[in-house]
Curated annotation (Swiss-Prot):
Gene: Myh8
Domain spans labelled Myosin motor: 88-781
Modified residues (Phosphotyrosine): Y389, Y424, Y1463, Y1491
Domain remark in the UniProt entry: The rodlike tail sequence is highly repetitive, showing cycles of a 28-residue repeat pattern composed of 4 heptapeptides, characteristic for alpha-helical coiled coils.
Protein name per its UniProtKB record: Myosin-8
Keyword Cytoplasm set for record: yes
Annotated localization: Cytoplasm, Myofibril
Residue ranges occupied by any Myosin N-terminal SH3-like domain in the UniProt entry: 35-84
UniProt region (Actin-binding), positions on chain: 658-680, 760-774
Protein function: Muscle contraction.
Main location: cytoplasm
Segments forming domain IQ: 781-813
Subunit structure: Muscle myosin is a hexameric protein that consists of 2 heavy chain subunits (MHC), 2 alkali light chain subunits (MLC) and 2 regulatory light chain subunits (MLC-2).
Post-translational modification Pros-methylhistidine, affected residues: H756
């Protein structure tokens, strides 16, 4: 590396002397005298290494003289040669001649002494903390390093940053800078400098401001400002560092395609939240607390309600409160400014300060203990008020939540009391949680602000994470931090050493693999492997009873002695207790595991968190918006997390984040910066040798230098090398012929004058030693300088030669011009020449003018063309620029796509290899898992065998219980003897007290036995084997029977007391029976009320049927009237047409008669008669109209009265319904009271049972022990037989249950098939009904066609009438004309008369034909009416079919209810089986506890037995046979002592195995819980299927109901019956508690339906009124038509009369004209009336259509109500699940339900057409309740039997416990031996279990890795395919262009 001159260093300004030695120093160093043979470094204990000079050598010893003048004699291997002076303070230690520890140490020390803190060490940079400010980060330094290569500038963090930046731009690869080192080494400062550098060099060109949204500064300012804010909340003073980062951060700075800043983001790790509440003495909490209290911003003090003295707050004053190197006031302003720059809103800013202040107040909250209670209560509320105010909470709610939190137990929440310490712990946890979540929220907000949404391509990541920590007290936080450093060190080693050497092998370079001893895999696997420290910690967190001790024991069992990195710490005085030690790369660390389980689970007070979530402060509420407690997570995400945990632990989250970080780092090109802490005292310039050497070793600095020297750190591809360095010797590579790049590179390097041992040729690259590539670069620069100089000389020579030629041409031209000018000067004065001068221009002027004109035209054309060509040229230039830009972009895109494609292919290949390896591992693990499953199956079989033997022993226990009854009989015989033993009472009282205590202990042990089920099974397995041994021991114990007899009659008083207690118990039992009788009487009363309601329902059903009949009759009448109205409407229209035609004819006739000369007198009289008849007809018409109107009004009134009556009936029914609902609620309250009474009775019963047990225990103390021991063997045998029979009985019951389940499954399938069949039948019936409806529609259509035909005939008739009228008018005209011209035109009149007579004859014939046709039409009308009647019959048949369908539906409902009943019975039986199983488990558990407790008291009893035996031996000595008994007792004593030793050893083994067995039991219980949850899930799925079926059938039923909407109109009659039935149902539903919701939902649906029906009824009423109006109008039209018909007939008669008396008609002509005029006016009025009626008809039709549309809407609403009912049915199913506890109350209603069923059958016949749907529902409900009543009665009977049995069992068991206590001496030996065997069995089982768990864990992990690998492979393959397709498209596009 070439050192720059002082002039070159001038650009660094005042930083130059801190970066590189001056030229003067370098020259002095080179001229410094140096003896390479004698100048050495020597190892020395104090200084590690010292500079020395060799004095002499003697064999393997060397004598040296140190700099301080001391003489030392050391071994040769402790002497290291010194580097020449020119290497002093060398910038890259890899360049040193002698590379060793002292050389590196002293180079760093000398540079540090000269304040050159940065030094290269091979491929990475080493920096030493100066502990003072140096001017090496000034802006001029930043500018000086920009764009400089590494070897062109001194070592600096800016150089590393710039190299990473340049690599990112040139290599198009993400970069990372890993700044690592111990705490206090300067990592955070260097991180800030890196960010400063990028923010300076990568800004946009004109420093544009970001004006979007909330941003207050540029992106560069925000990136820089993020550090002060994060440091304020995340940095604190520690022992080693005043500004220590207590969290790790990975800052990614994203750059755009041009290398400018695009955005940034920050990821944080491991915030040390415990520092919020606890600090060591020499440390302090986070800076923000002390910044706030610095009083720089007084408004904060006032806003946060705090003081300026940190000592007032406990959380922040446990250590120091000031730091000399930090000005808290200035830091507060910087923090406040950073918050503003980063775009936090004012509200968010205030929230940050308030939450910080609230944390401070939390530490001052005081609590005290209540008097005579452990419950905590607040000791003052002032501090809590402040904290709650700052968090926008209610102070009382906060204190209540802290002291009385609500805890979820099952599905309910209960209030839990807290001790004072628990409350303080909760407050501390909440403070830490608030602070941590606020910190993470701030990081998220910063990231949102830094994300500018600009396009970004690559990023540079800067990692600043807490360094390695070794404290006196190291906890879980230190383990996580140290583990992170282990992983980073491993990544560094892998990148620097392993990958480097693997690259050599891959390229085929001769290389001997060097093991640098930096393999950290052992320590990492110890921490993170499946059975490592984190795995065991997470496993312990899953167990509720796990403690720190159990965690430590598991760690020791798993790793102590098995791993060299796991050690047991040695106790050291003055230091905190350590539980285990880990050997890290940086040293051995002692860890204290106190509180690790709680830290890992990180529990919070859920009640306070709930308050936080509801806080008015948005920030606080958002912090905890996603929080869910462990219980809630367990319920919501069961099985979703790894290893079955219901929540993610701190360690799991930490490992997940760490893995993400390592993945990010592996995807980048890393640059390493090693920070070194020079001393522990923070003294500038001082360096502790041992401390620095330790860091150099641990950081891998020396190994990095060594491999850099030995290896080949620089490499380049052959093609690139040939292209770049060909210039060094172009002649070495021949031109014009192909030559391989590798051979060309070899020739080129061979021809250059360099050291040929400094490079190697690989397969694809050429490798260089350190420094050689730099030398080649310098040679290339020199060669390029030479070539450029030569090129410049040639170019300059060429240019000068061209200029010389131009000069020659100019010279010749000048000579020519001079010659011509001289000649001209000689001849210009000649006369001829003057004339020539004058004439010559004139000759050419004309030509010149023409030429000028031509030239102008050409000039103009040329100018235009030039303009066009210029525009075209510009356009083409723009296109060319655009195309060039697109071409460049495409080339860049193709290149990037090619690079990414290659990378993706490489990753894909790697993933495929990993996948294959993982598949092989999975196959292996699967095989091992199968083996383990087989072993588990064998263990399960053994377990079942043990269970069988346990059942046999239970039978033996039952036999023992029978002895209680016998002892009761003997009690009376002992009463007389007790009087004689009263004197011995005092001596025996103590024994009795002991026995009582032992009895209680045995009972407690009996209860505890349930927790150790598996261990007891093993013990029971050997009890049967010990029976023979017990028989032998009985003979030995017979000698002690005499003394035991005395204990039979010792407590007469106790007996009397027991008898009194028994009497009290009997009296309480009688009270309970009386309460039961009262309940029965109440139930009977309710049954009587139900029967009354049923009778009411029947009456209402009868009324409903009558109303339905009336409605049907009215509907039929309405239809007939509608048809008549239509017919009359048509006939009326035709009559109107006829009337108008006749009017016109009359007018014509009158005109003709006037023309003929007037009318005769006869005609006048006829006209008068006609007029009178017309007046008469008009009066008749008006009278008929009035009569019809009166009739219509009467009908209307009648209809309105009927509607009002029906409304009143509806209101009455509503009131009845409300009354019934009220009675229902009252009955429900009574049922609740009865339930509470029953619970009180049950409690009283339990208390009585306890009293009975106590009395029985006291009675058992009076029992004789002689006969008990005498009968012991026989009773055990009997008990065994009984247990065997019970086991057989249980197995038989189990088989029966299985058979029942299978039978129910079959019945379920049959029910499903039956349901499908019913569905099919329903569809067929629906199809038939649709066919009938279609036929009815077609018939109606035919009817309409015939009606139209009838109307056409009427129109024809009207036409004839018009013709007749026309003829009459003609007659009148002729008459008039005749009167005028009678004399003149007599003949004409005669002819006209004849013609008129002919025309009248023809008209009469036509009229007759029309009348005949009308008669035929009447017949047709009659026939159609008959057809309509037939269709009505068909409709009735359809209704009958609907009724049949209803009946089938009811049958279906019956089948469904029976199936539901069977299902519920099966579920109840399943629950009872589960209860029995739990009861048996409880009993077995109690037995096991009793046995274990008997072991505890065995020794005491044995000593007592020995004393008794000694007394027996003393008594026998007084007799003659004393000696013999003593000898026998001594034998027994020896034997017992020997057995005692054996038992003691076995007992210890059994205890150890018992612990293992307990762990096994816990694991099995977890597995059982998982299986149970799976079964519950399947049951839930089945329930959902059943619910779906129910919903489907409900929809079918509701659809059928919608087809009967017409019948719903008759609901008023059926309402009374329905209400009565609902009342009965409500009486029964009182027993169903939560199932009442179904009734409520159904009631609401019914009300909605009633509302819809009321609307429909109103529309129907409107339609009926409209129909009545139409009927009235029809009657009017009919009367008018009849009048017209009569008028036509009279006109016909008039015509005949006119023919006979023509003369009279002439006289009456004038009157006829007047009448015609009157008729005309009347006709016009009738036409207007007709139009009005037609408008009314059209309006009525529109109203009818509206009614139809409204009915359709009502149908849609009904369907919607049906869907709502289905949803409510689903909710009902959920609510029914909670009604199991009321089933016992339902059983008493069985008889009532049967009566209801009978009456419902009768009601069904009465209301077949009425309230069918309601009755069907009620019947189904009744049947359901009937089944439930039966089940409840059965269960009640079984419960009574079980109660009696359990009472008997309790008595027997209490007696048996006394028997066990007395017989414990004989059982001792047997139990000890059993325990020994149990130990061995447990040990074997535990080992198998552990091996199985380990294998399963490995299998799961491998399976998970395989899945991830497969996913990655698939993703990579898809990406490769996409990239290939994209690349092809790009190439195609380029080629097309």
């Amino acid at each position: 590396m070439s050192a720059g001159s002082d002039a070159e260093m001038a650009i660094f300004g005042e930083a130059a002397p801190y970066l590189r030695k001056s030229e003067k120093e370098r020259i002095e160093a080179q001229n410094k005298p140096f003896d390479a043979k004698t100048s050495v470094f020597v190892a020395e204990p104090k200084e590690s290494y010292v500079k020395s000079v060799i004095q002499s050598k003697d064999g393997g010893k060397v004598t040296v003289k140190t700099e301080s003048g001391a003489t030392l004699t050391v071994k040769e291997d402790q002497v290291f040669p010194m580097n020449p002076p020119k290497y002093d303070k060398i910038e890259d230690m890899a360049m040193m001649t002698h590379l060793h520890e002292p050389g590196v140490l002293y180079n760093l020390k000398e540079r540090y002494a000269a304040w050159m803190i940065y030094t290269y060490s091979g491929l990475f940079c080493v920096t030493v903390n100066p502990y003072k400010w140096l001017p090496v980060y000034n802006p001029e330094v930043v500018a000086a390093y920009r764009g400089k290569k590494r070897q062109e500038a001194p070592p600096h963090i800016f150089s590393i940053s710039d190299n990473a930046y340049q690599f990112m731009l040139t290599d198009r690869e993400n970069q990372s800078i890993l700044i690592t080192g111990e705490s206090g080494a300067g990592k955070t400062v260097n991180t800030k400098r890196v960010i400063q550098y990028f923010a300076t060099i990568a800004v946009t060109g004109d420093k544009k401001k970001e004006e979007s949204g909330k941003m207050q500064g540029t992106l560069e300012d925000q990136i820089i400002s993020a550090n002060p804010l994060l440091e304020a909340f995340g940095n604190a003073k520690t022992v080693r560092n005043d500004n220590s980062s207590r969290f790790g951060k990975f800052i990614r700075i994203h750059f755009g395609t041009t290398g400018k800043l695009a955005s940034a983001d920050i990821e944080t790790y491991l915030l040390e939240k415990s520092r919020v509440t606890f600090q060591l003495k020499a440390e302090r909490s986070y800076h923000i607390f002390y910044q706030i209290t610095s009083n720089k911003k007084p408004e904060l003090i006032e806003m946060l309600l705090i003081t300026t003295n940190p000592y007032d707050y406990a959380f922040v004053s446990q250590g120091e409160i000031t730091v000399p190197s930090i000005d808290d006031q200035e830091e507060l302003m910087a923090t406040d400014s950073a918050i503003d720059i980063l775009g936090f809103s004012p509200e968010e800013k205030v929230s940050i300060y308030k939450l910080t202040g609230a944390v401070m107040h939390y530490g001052n909250m005081k609590f005290k203990q209540k008097q005579r209670e452990e419950q905590a209560e607040p000791d003052g509320t002032e501090v809590a008020d402040k904290a709650a105010y700052l968090q926008c909470l209610n102070s009382a709610d906060l204190l209540k939540a802290l002291c009385y939190p609500r805890v979820k137990v099952g599905n309910e929440y209960v209030t839990k009391g807290q001790t004072v310490q628990q409350v303080y712990n909760a407050v501390g946890a909440l403070a830490k949680a608030v602070y941590e979540k606020m910190f993470l929220w701030m990081v998220t907000r910063i990231n949102q602000q830094l994300d500018t949404k600009q396009p970004r391509q690559y990023f540079i990541g800067v990692l600043d994470i807490a360094g390695f920590e070794i404290f006196d007290f190291n906890s879980l936080e230190q383990l996580c931090i140290n583990f992170t450093n282990e992983k980073l060190q491993q990544f560094f080693n892998h990148h620097m050493f392993v990958l480097e050497q693997e690259e050599y092998k891959k390229e085929g370079i001769e290389w001997t693999f060097i093991d640098f001893g930096m393999d950290l895999a052992a320590c990492i696997e110890l921490i993170e492997k499946p059975l490592g420290i984190f795995s065991i910690l997470e496993e312990e967190c899953m167990f509720p009873k796990a403690t720190d001790t159990s965690f430590k024991n598991k760690l020791y069992d798993q790793h102590l002695g098995k791993s060299n990195n796991f050690q047991k710490p040695k106790p050291t005085k003055g230091k905190a207790e350590a539980h285990f030690s880990l050997v890290h790369y940086a040293g051995t660390v002692d860890y204290n595991i106190t509180g690790w389980l709680d830290k890992n689970k990180d529990p919070l007070n859920d009640t306070v968190v709930g308050l936080y979530q509801k806080s008015a402060m948005k920030t606080l509420a958002s912090l905890f918006s996603t929080y869910a407690s462990a219980e809630a997570d367990g319920g919501a995400k069961k099985g979703a997390k790894k290893k079955g945990s219901s929540f993610q632990t701190v360690s799991a989250l930490f490992r997940e984040n760490l893995n993400k970080l390592m993945t990010n780092l592996r995807s980048t090109h890393p640059h390493f910066v090693r920070c070194i802490i020079p001393n522990e005292t923070k003294t500038p310039g001082a360096m502790e040798h041992e401390l620095v050497l330790h860091q150099l070793r641990c950081n891998g600095v020396l190994e990095g230098i060594r491999i850099c020297r030995k290896g080949f750190p620089s490499r380049i591809l052959y093609g690139d090398f040939k292209q770049r360095y060909k210039v060094l010797n172009a002649s070495a590579i021949p031109e014009g012929q192909f030559i391989d790049s590798k051979k060309a590179s070899e020739k080129l390097l061979g021809s250059i004058d360099i050291d040929h041992t400094q490079y190697k040729f690989g397969h694809t690259k050429v490798f260089f030693k350190a420094g050689l590539l730099g030398l080649l670069e310098e040679m290339r620069d020199e060669k390029l300088a030479q070539i450029i100089t030569r090129t410049q000389a040639v170019c300059r020579g060429y240019l000068m030669r061209v200029e010389y030629q131009k000069m020659l041409l100019r010279r010749e031209s000048i000579f020519c011009i001079q010659y011509n000018v001289r000649a001209f000067m000689n001849v210009k004065h000649w006369p001829w020449m003057k004339l020539f001068f004058k004439i010559k221009p004139l000759l050419k002027s004309a030509e010149t003018e023409k030429e000028m004109a031509t030239m102008k035209e050409e000039f103009q054309k040329t100018k235009d063309e030039l303009a066009k060509s210029e525009a075209k040229r510009k356009e083409l230039e723009e296109k060319m620029v655009t195309l060039l830009k697109e071409k460049n972009d495409l080339q860049l895109q193709v290149q990037s796509e090619a690079d990414s494609l290659a990378d993706a292919e490489e990753r894909c290949e790697q993933l495929i290899k990993n996948k294959i390896q993982l598949e092989a591992k999975i196959k292996e693990v699967t095989e091992r898992a199968e083996d383990e499953e087989e072993i588990n199956a064998e263990l399960t079989a053994k377990k079942r065998k043990l269970e069988d033997e346990c059942s046999e022993l239970k039978k033996d226990i039952d036999d023992l219980e029978l002895t209680l009854a016998k002892v009761e009989k003997e009690k009376h015989a002992t009463e007389n003897k007790v009087k004689n033993l009263t004197e011995e009472m005092a001596g025996l009282d103590e024994n009795i007290a002991k026995l009582t205590k032992e009895k209680k202990a045995l009972q407690e042990a009996h209860q505890q036995t349930l927790d150790d089920l598996q261990a007891e099974e093993d013990k029971v397995n050997t009890l049967t084997k010990a029976k023979t041994k017990l028989e032998q021991q009985v003979d030995d114990l017979e000698g002690s029977l005499e003394q035991e007899k005395k204990l039979r009659m010792d407590l007469e008083r106790a007996k009397r007391k027991l008898e009194g207690d028994l009497k009290l118990a009997q009296e309480s039992t009688m009270d309970i029976e009386n309460d039961k009788q009262q309940l029965d009487e109440k139930l009977k009363k309710k049954e009587f009320e139900i029967s009354n309601l049923i009778s009411k329902i029947e009456d209402e059903q009868a009324v409903e049927i009558q109303l339905q009949k009336k409605i049907k009759e009215l509907q039929a009448r309405i239809e007939e009237l509608e048809e008549e109205i239509e017919a009359e409407r048509a006939s009326r229209a035709k009559a109107e047409k006829q009337r108008s035609d006749l009017s016109r004819e009359l007018e014509e006739i009158s005109e003709r008669l006037e023309e003929a000369g007037g009318a005769t007198s006869a005609q006048v009289e006829m006209n008068k008669k006609r007029e009178t008849e017309f007046q008469k007809l008009r009066r008749d018409l008006e009278e008929a109209t009035l009569q019809h109107e009166a009739t219509a009004a009467a009908l209307r009134k009648k209809h309105a009265d009927s509607v009002a009556e029906l409304g009143e009936q509806i209101d009455n029914l509503q009131r009845v319904k409300q009354k019934l609902e009220k009675e229902k609620s009252e009955l429900k309250m009574e049922i609740d009271d009865l339930s509470s009474n029953a619970e009180a009775i049950a409690k009283a019963k339990g208390n009585l049972e306890k009293m009975c047990r106590t009395l029985e225990d006291q009675v058992s103390e009076l029992k004789s022990k002689e006969e008990e021991q005498q009968r012991l063997i026989n009773e055990l045998t009997a008990q065994r037989a009984r247990l065997q029979t019970e086991a057989g009985e249980y197995s038989r019951q189990l088989d029966e249950k299985d058979a029942l389940v299978s039978q129910l499954s079959r019945s379920k399938q049959a029910s499903t098939q039956q349901i499908e069949e019913l569905k099919r039948q329903l569809e067929e019936e629906t199809k038939a009904k649709n066919a009938l409806a279609h036929a009815l529609q077609s018939s109606r259509h035919d009817c309409d066609l015939l009606r139209e035909q009838y109307e056409e005939e009427q129109e024809g008739k009207a036409e004839l009438q018009r013709a007749l009228s026309k003829a009459n008018s003609e007659v009148a005209q002729w008459r008039t004309k005749y009167e005028t011209d009678a004399i003149q035109r007599t003949e004409e009149l005669e002819e006209a008369k004849k013609k008129l007579a002919q025309r009248l004859q023809a008209a009469e014939e036509h009229v007759e034909a029309v009348n005949a046709k009308c008669a035929s039409l009447e017949k047709t009308k009659q026939r159609l009416q008959n057809e309509v009647e037939d269709l009505m019959i068909d409709v009735e048949r359809t209704n009958a079919a609907c009724a049949a369908l209803d009946k089938k539906q009811r049958n279906f409902d019956k089948v469904l209810s029976e199936w539901r009943q069977k299902y519920e019975e099966t579920q109840a039986e399943l629950e009872s089986c589960q209860k029995e199983s739990r009861t048996l488990s409880t009993e077995l558990f109690k037995v096991k506890n009793a046995y274990e407790e008997s072991l505890d008291h065995l020794e005491t009893l044995r000593r007592e037995n020995k004393n008794l035996q000694q007394e027996i031996s003393d008594l026998t000595e007084q007799i003659a046979e004393g000696g013999k008994h003593i000898h026998e007792l001594e034998k027994i004593k020896k034997q017992v002592e020997q057995e005692k030793c054996e038992i003691q050893a076995a007992l210890e083994e059994a205890e150890a195995s018992l612990e293992h067995e307990e762990g096994k039991i816990l694991r099995i219980q977890l597995e059982l819980n998982q299986v149970k949850s799976e079964i519950d899930r399947k049951i839930a799925e089945k329930d959902e299927e059943i619910d779906q079926l129910k919903r489907n059938h409900v929809r079918v039923v509701e659809t059928m109901q919608s087809t009967l909407d017409a019948e719903i109109r008759s609901r008023n009659d059926a309402l009374r019956v329905k209400k009565k039935m609902e009342g009965d149902l409500n009486e029964m539903e009182i027993q169903l508690n939560h199932a009442n919701r179904l009734a409520a939902e159904s009631l609401r649906n019914y009300r909605n339906t009633q509302g819809i029906l009321k609307d429909t009824q109103l529309h129907l009423d409107d339609a009926l009124r409209g129909q009545e109006d139409l009927k009235e109008q029809l009657a009017i039209v009919e009367r008018r038509a009849n009048l017209l018909q009569a008028e036509i007939e009279e006109l016909r008669a008039t015509l005949e009369q006119t023919e006979r008396s023509r003369k009279i008609a002439e006289q009456e002509l004038l009157d006829a004209s007047e009448r015609v005029q009157l008729l005309h006016t009347q006709n016009t009025s009738l036409i207007n009336t007709k139009k009005k009626l037609e408008n009314d008809v059209s309006q009525l039709q529109s109203e009818v259509e509206e009614v139809i549309q409204e009915s359709r809407n009502a149908e849609e609403k009904a369907k919607k109500a049906i869907t709502d009912a289905a949803m409510m049915a689903e909710e009902l199913k959920k609510e029914q699940d909670t009604s199991a506890h009321l089933e016992r109350m339902k059983k008493n209603m069985e008889q009532t339900v049967k009566d209801l069923q009978h009456r419902l059958d009768e009601a069904e016949q009465l209301a077949l057409k009425g309230g069918k749907k309601q009755i069907q529902k009620l019947e189904a409900r009744v049947r359901e309740l009937e089944g439930e009543v039966e089940n409840e009665q059965k269960r009640n009977a079984e419960a009574v039997k079980g109660l009696r049995k359990h009472e008997r069992r309790v008595k027997e068991l209490t007696y048996q416990t006394e028997e066990d206590r007395k017989n414990v001496l004989r059982l001792q030996d047997l139990v000890d031996k059993l325990q020994a065997k149990v130990k061995s069995y447990k040990r074997q089982a535990e080992e198998a279990e552990e091996q199985s768990n380990a294998n399963l864990a490995k299998f799961r992990k491998l399976q998970h890795e395989l899945e991830e690998a497969e996913e990655r492979a698939d993703i990579a393959e898809s990406q490769v395919n996409k990239l290939r397709v994209k690349s092809r498209e790009v190439h195609t596009k380029i080629s097309a262009e």
